[in-house]
From Swiss-Prot:
The lineage of its organism: Bacteria, Pseudomonadati, Pseudomonadota, Betaproteobacteria, Burkholderiales. One of its GO terms (molecular function) is rRNA (uridine-2'-O-)-methyltransferase activity. The gene is rlmE. Specifically methylates the uridine in position 2552 of 23S rRNA at the 2'-O position of the ribose in the fully assembled 50S ribosomal subunit. S-adenosyl-L-methionine binds at G60, W62, D89, D105, D134. This is Ribosomal RNA large subunit methyltransferase E. The keyword Lipid biosynthesis does not apply. It is an enzyme of class 2 (transferase).
Length: 221
């Protein structure tokens, strides 16, 4: 009975969520688009001409938002965007116009090589401007296990960013407050000159979800 009450409560909140309604009106696949939108408006992350990689992209609302920002440029002509968005996820994703999607686990060498190849082609052999990660583990409710899974996914995004970002590039990852949160923030501070924590209004109040932004890579010793 308690589980049914919880499900009915979640469904009621979801149906009446203003961000869900806005996403439906504006054609976004998920309300998560407005989390990125708010952070982008505050921090000016996405600009015309950029090459952007979206890790854990499905169902695709972050890729949609990034694509729309790159399309909103005087240099975006003939239906093309000014820049490139490369998205990857374990799960399938319906195509997003102008977004290159790879389905697979980028921890696997063959998938990682494909991702690198697509990114190099999109960037003209240069490094990239922005890495977005909305990756999240399946949470078990066991605090220490969940903390380890969250930290692991943040580490994957951080390692990818270190290898592929321009020195002036940025990394935005989803995280959750918990026992490993401060360690993740410290890792960002070791690798980026500017680190900020963001909790957009579109994140549900009851959620421990937060976002960590790193900008301007530090030189490797």
């Amino acid at each position: 009975m308690a589980k049914n009450k919880f499900n009915h409560s979640w469904l009621h909140d979801h149906i009446n969520d203003p961000y869900v309604k806005m996403a439906q009106r504006e054609g976004y696949r998920a309300r998560a688009a407005y989390k990125l939108k708010e952070i982008d408006e505050q921090d000016k992350l996405i600009r015309p001409g950029q090459v952007i990689v979206d890790l854990g992209a499905a169902p695709g609302s972050w890729s949609q938002y990034a694509r729309n920002k790159l399309a909103d440029s005087p240099r975006a002509k003939d239906g093309r965007i000014d820049g490139a968005v490369v998205a990857i996820d374990l799960l399938p994703m319906e195509p997003v116009a102008d977004v290159t999607f790879i389905q697979g686990d980028f921890r696997e060498e063959s998938v990682f090589r494909e991702l690198e190849s697509v990114v190099l082609d999109a960037s003209g052999g240069n490094k990239i401007d922005l890495v977005l990660s909305d990756m999240a583990p399946n949470l078990s409710g066991v605090a220490f296990a969940d903390a380890a899974r969250i930290e692991y996914l943040c580490d994957l995004a951080l390692e990818f960013a270190q290898a592929h970002l321009k020195p002036e590039g940025a990394l935005l990852v989803k995280c959750f407050h918990g026992s490993g949160y401060s360690q993740i923030v410290e890792k960002f501070k070791r690798h980026f000159k500017v680190v900020a924590k963001r909790k957009p209004k579109a994140s549900r109040d009851k959620s421990s979800e937060t976002f960590i932004l790193g900008r301007y890579l530090k030189a490797v010793d």
